[in-house]
């Protein structure tokens, strides 16, 4: 058991990582907590673990007896351990007991007035330190270096009967502490002290035993009937809420961790508790003590229970402050990510604690902030213990050192820093042999390496001394860069230690008050650049450094969002520059996670993720990798609900573009393979490329991207070594595939044809080949056999594609002439074939010009018939002279009438006539449709709307079929869109009426049904008319 405060050495929280990956979540136990107010702590006993502590012989004997009694006990029926809390009543004068929090502020002289904290120190922490010291003395007796052994023995003896804080706080003594902890007997003693100590403290300061504000079990309540989330509200005695604790059960896929003897233990379930960091609701002190769970997620018996405890002491403003953490040691984490759960080995068993790596680090930083001292999180004890297991992959944590302490250490008159691990009477000697020696060694870098050769703390002291002395920003950046280089080049450090030291340097840079914000950004970016250029660190390990660096930058309170984003973008650049794709994925995923889990506002998190996405999008990676990385960022952002709808849309658009580009490249490659295939003749190639064209048209990408894709495919065909006619045949096939496509809208077909012709015009090939391909495209359009008006628009699209190209003017005109020539040829062919197939007994398609011409013919017939009837003698054979005379008169009359009618016909066809052009007819039609839709919108009730549909869209035959069908389609689209938007974003919802966002779904369905019935009625009527042959009369009467 150790107290995790802000003191280096054994009191600190030692961590080590295992490589097992946490995959799901665990079963909760119940917490014990205590709370106290500022009037309830008259005790002024020692609090700081560095302060002196004396034990009487009677106290030692009593403690040993308690331990023996505990291990000699047998309990026929074991009771489960509970979580608990305790608090000091707001009006009480009694001290507050706590296992997991402090109820008194730590003053500058390291005093505390909290009896629970004092009890934990006296019954658990100090006895454990004494036992370790005894074991170290035994180990020293066998040490070969007798001078060193004697020196260390004196250090321990000088502190004997005290807290041994100086010895345990000296980094140079860690190897002796680690060796002692390898002793199995010592480990058993430490575990027994911990269990017996907790049992004693929990019993002594229990509310059930009459201690006011003492420990009592937490009453968890399920949240929203969910089995994996529980909560409880902790209040002081006045009923004021101190905090709400949330507990999440994590039922995970089984993963294994290793015990000290190498045995693998499977973890099936654990829990996470969201320990509060800041408390500002009510006054008082609070102690939260959470029992460690067994590997299967169940609670141990009370006689085997150990606890993770958070001590919250009343601060200057009366509000609880997180002052200290008590937890079993060595503390390890099942992974290197912030979500990795903490676990311990105790009594030969594995237990999980209700805290993750990320939460633990966050709590330790708050402890540091509230006590104003450094916190050593390097976890050397745990790391060395895992070496016994054969596991050296664990990642030690960084040394976190506040600037004020660093300044105090460098403002002394001494110019040379004397590291704590070096005897006070010996100067620090450079150990340059530890570092790789270039031909010319930078003296500053050598100094940094020298400082690092003793401890990371000395390197930070060295760096901060330089940053305080040097005011030039560029030189400050150089110094930070030198330190980063020294860390990564240190041959004595393994990867884990290098990572920890880089993180420590980054945090020191961000929090250093001697640096301007811009210099901080440049300094951190220099560290990132050093990581990028380092040749010894594997890329996967670099990606972890990047994630940690981003987390430090984003969570800093000393930087503005703009500066944080600059550091983020640099980290992303470095991540994208890593050599293997797995490391790049790990880096970007890690950076994304750091953004989501940061303390930024939701809006700022969204902005940061957009910056990550932009960097990925602008990179030179393959489209496939961009798609993977950007898709992961978008998915994580959406799941975490930190991206606004606009940001999601923007990122999705970028992703769509990448996907489309990837698809385009794949299809171009397919076409290149078809063209190069010697087994394919022209017909086979045409068919294959037609199929590719159809695939493009069928794909869900936007019409614009489809056009770009087919434009690129056309260029590939045009620039292939095929002869001109073969190219023309292939392009003809593409044109036919576009013109005859079943689902594309006419406007999309037209824009796609423009793109294909643009590809022809801009291709690098002979003009004659381009002309042949242009003609082929026009012929393909005609092969589509569309409505003549639509075909005409498509042929015009060919000319527009030529205009939009970068071809020279002379080539553009030549290509337009070729297009017009091909269109004229096809129109002539169609006319000839139409005349050959003409059958007056069958109905013909009628356009306006045909109708007007028929009117003229009918008018001529109506004139000729009366004239002939007025001269019946013309039907008889009469004298030749009379016949000629009368015939001449009749023909003269007919001629006059014909001229009159022709002139009238010409007038109608003139610009001033009343024959409307296609564009004018479309405009009138659109206007009428809009008027009908608008009028429909004024009908408020379902009945009025249904009546409108019947009267105007079914019964009113004065309106053309086209206008009525267009109106129906537009109204159907509006109704469908209303319902889709309403269901997607339900602002108003009642289950009985099914009204969503103000849209009555039942009425909506009725109206859509009426519209579809009207459409079917019109179509059926039209089909009926077409199926009835119309017998046409000749324009002229029989002779």
Swiss-Prot record:
<feature type="compositionally biased region" description="Basic and acidic residues">
    <location>
        <begin position="54"/>
        <end position="69"/>
    </location>
</feature>
<feature type="region of interest" description="Disordered">
    <location>
        <begin position="1"/>
        <end position="115"/>
    </location>
</feature>
<protein>
    <recommendedName>
        <fullName>Antigenic heat-stable 120 kDa protein</fullName>
    </recommendedName>
</protein>
<feature type="region of interest" description="Disordered">
    <location>
        <begin position="408"/>
        <end position="438"/>
    </location>
</feature>
<keyword id="KW-0963">Cytoplasm</keyword>
<dbReference type="GO" id="GO:0005737">
    <property type="term" value="C:cytoplasm"/>
</dbReference>
<feature type="region of interest" description="Disordered">
    <location>
        <begin position="1020"/>
        <end position="1039"/>
    </location>
</feature>
<dbReference type="Pfam" id="PF12574">
    <property type="entry name" value="120_Rick_ant"/>
</dbReference>
<dbReference type="InterPro" id="IPR020954">
    <property type="entry name" value="Rickettsia_antigen_120kDa"/>
</dbReference>
<feature type="compositionally biased region" description="Basic and acidic residues">
    <location>
        <begin position="1030"/>
        <end position="1039"/>
    </location>
</feature>
<feature type="compositionally biased region" description="Low complexity">
    <location>
        <begin position="85"/>
        <end position="114"/>
    </location>
</feature>
<feature type="compositionally biased region" description="Polar residues">
    <location>
        <begin position="31"/>
        <end position="44"/>
    </location>
</feature>
<feature type="compositionally biased region" description="Polar residues">
    <location>
        <begin position="424"/>
        <end position="438"/>
    </location>
</feature>
């Amino acid at each position: 058991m150790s107290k995790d405060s802000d003191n280096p050495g054994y009191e600190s929280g030692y961590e080590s990582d295992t490589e097992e990956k946490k995959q799901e979540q665990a079963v909760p136990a119940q917490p014990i907590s205590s709370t106290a107010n500022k009037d309830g702590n008259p005790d002024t006993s020692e609090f700081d673990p560095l302060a002196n502590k004396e034990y009487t012989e009677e106290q030692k004997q009593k403690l040993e007896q308690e331990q023996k009694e505990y291990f000699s006990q047998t309990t026929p029926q074991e009771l489960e351990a509970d979580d608990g809390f305790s608090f000091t009543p707001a009006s009480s004068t009694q001290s507050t007991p706590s296992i997991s929090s402090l109820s008194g502020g730590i003053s500058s002289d390291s005093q505390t007035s909290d009896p629970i904290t004092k009890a934990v120190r006296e019954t658990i922490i100090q006895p454990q330190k004494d036992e370790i010291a005894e074991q170290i003395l035994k180990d020293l007796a066998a040490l070969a270096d007798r001078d060193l052994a004697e020196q260390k023995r004196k250090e321990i003896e000088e502190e004997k009967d005290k807290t041994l804080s100086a010895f345990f706080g000296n980094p140079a003594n860690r190897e002796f502490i680690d060796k002692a902890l390898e002793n199995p007997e010592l480990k058993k003693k430490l575990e027994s002290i911990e269990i017996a100590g907790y049992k004693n403290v929990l019993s002594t300061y229990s509310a059930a035993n009459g201690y006011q504000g003492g420990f009592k079990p937490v009453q968890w309540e399920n949240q929203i009937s969910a089995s994996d989330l529980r909560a409880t509200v902790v209040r002081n005695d006045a009923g004021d809420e101190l905090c709400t604790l949330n507990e999440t059960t994590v039922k995970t896929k089984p993963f294994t961790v290793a015990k000290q003897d190498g045995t693998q233990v499977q973890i099936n379930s654990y829990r996470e508790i969201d320990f509060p960091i800041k408390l500002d609701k009510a006054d008082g002190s609070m102690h939260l003590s959470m029992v460690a769970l067994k590997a299967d997620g169940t609670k141990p018996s009370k006689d085997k229970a150990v606890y993770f405890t958070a001590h919250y002491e009343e601060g200057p403003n009366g509000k609880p402050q997180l002052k200290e953490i008590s937890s079993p040691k060595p503390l390890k984490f099942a992974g290197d990510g912030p979500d990795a759960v903490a676990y311990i080995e105790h009594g030969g068993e594995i237990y999980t604690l209700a805290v993750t790596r990320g939460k633990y680090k966050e709590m330790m930083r708050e402890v540091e902030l509230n006590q104003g001292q450094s916190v050593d999180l390097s976890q050397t004890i745990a790391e060395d213990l895992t070496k016994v297991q054969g596991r050296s992959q664990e990642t030690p944590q960084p040394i976190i050192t506040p600037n004020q302490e660093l300044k105090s250490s460098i403002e002394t008159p001494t110019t040379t820093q004397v590291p704590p691990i070096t005897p006070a009477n010996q100067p620090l000697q450079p150990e340059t042999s530890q570092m790789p020696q270039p031909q010319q060694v930078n003296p500053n870098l050598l100094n940094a390496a020298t400082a690092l050769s003793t401890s990371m703390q000395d390197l930070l002291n060295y760096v901060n001394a330089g940053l305080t002395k040097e005011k030039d920003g560029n030189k400050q950046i150089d110094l930070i860069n030198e330190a980063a280089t020294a860390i990564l080049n240190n041959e004595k450090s393994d990867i884990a230690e290098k990572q920890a030291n880089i993180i420590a340097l980054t945090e020191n840079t961000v929090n250093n008050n001697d640096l301007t914000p811009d210099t901080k950004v440049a300094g951190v970016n220099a560290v990132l650049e050093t990581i990028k250029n380092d040749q010894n660190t594997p890329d996967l390990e670099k990606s972890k450094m990047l994630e940690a660096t981003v987390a430090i930058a984003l969570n800093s309170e000393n930087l503005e969002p703009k500066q944080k984003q600059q550091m983020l973008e640099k980290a992303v650049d470095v991540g994208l520059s890593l050599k293997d794709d797995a490391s790049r994925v790990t880096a970007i995923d890690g950076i994304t996670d750091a953004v989501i889990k940061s303390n930024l506002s939701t809006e700022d998190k969204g902005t940061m993720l957009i910056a990550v996405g932009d960097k990925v999008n602008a990179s030179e990676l393959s489209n496939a990798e961009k798609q993977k990385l950007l898709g992961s960022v978008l998915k994580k952002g959406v799941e975490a609900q930190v991206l606004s709808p606009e940001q999601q849309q923007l990122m999705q658009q970028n992703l769509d573009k990448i996907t489309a580009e990837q698809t385009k490249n794949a299809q171009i490659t397919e076409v290149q393979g078809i063209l190069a295939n010697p087994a394919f003749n022209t017909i086979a190639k045409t068919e294959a490329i037609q199929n590719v064209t159809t695939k493009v048209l069928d794909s869900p990408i936007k019409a614009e991207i489809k056009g770009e894709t087919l434009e690129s495919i056309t260029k590939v065909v045009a620039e292939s070594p095929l002869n001109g006619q073969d190219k023309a045949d292939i392009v003809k096939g593409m044109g036919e595939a576009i013109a005859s496509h079943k689902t594309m809208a006419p406007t999309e077909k037209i824009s796609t044809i423009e793109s294909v012709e643009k590809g022809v015009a801009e291709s690098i090939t002979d003009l004659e080949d381009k002309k042949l391909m242009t003609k082929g495209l026009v012929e393909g359009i005609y092969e589509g056999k569309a409505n003549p008006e639509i075909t005409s628009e498509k042929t015009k699209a060919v000319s527009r594609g030529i205009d939009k190209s970068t071809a020279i003017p002379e080539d553009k005109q030549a290509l337009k002439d070729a297009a017009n020539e091909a269109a004229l040829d096809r129109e002539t062919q169609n006319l000839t074939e139409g005349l050959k197939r003409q059958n007056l007994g069958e109905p013909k398609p009628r356009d306006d010009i045909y109708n007007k011409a028929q009117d003229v013919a009918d008018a001529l017939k109506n004139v000729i018939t009366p004239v002939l009837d007025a001269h019946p003698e013309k039907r008889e054979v009469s004298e030749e002279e009379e016949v000629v005379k009368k015939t001449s008169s009749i023909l003269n009359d007919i001629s006059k009438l014909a001229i009159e009618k022709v002139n009238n016909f010409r007038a109608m066809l003139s610009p001033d006539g009343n024959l409307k052009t296609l564009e004018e007819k479309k405009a009138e039609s659109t206007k009428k449709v809009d008027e009908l839709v608008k009028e429909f919108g004024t009908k408020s009730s379902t009945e009025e709307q249904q009546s409108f549909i019947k009267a105007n869209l079914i019964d009113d035959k004065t309106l053309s079929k086209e206008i009525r069908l267009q109106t129906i389609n537009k109204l159907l689209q509006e109704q469908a869109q209303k319902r889709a938007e309403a269901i997607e974003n339900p602002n108003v919802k009642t289950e009985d009426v099914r009204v969503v966002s103000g849209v009555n779904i039942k009425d909506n369905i009725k109206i859509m049904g009426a519209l579809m019935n009207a459409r079917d009625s019109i179509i059926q009527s039209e089909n009926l008319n077409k199926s009835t042959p119309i017998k046409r009369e000749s324009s002229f009467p029989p002779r």
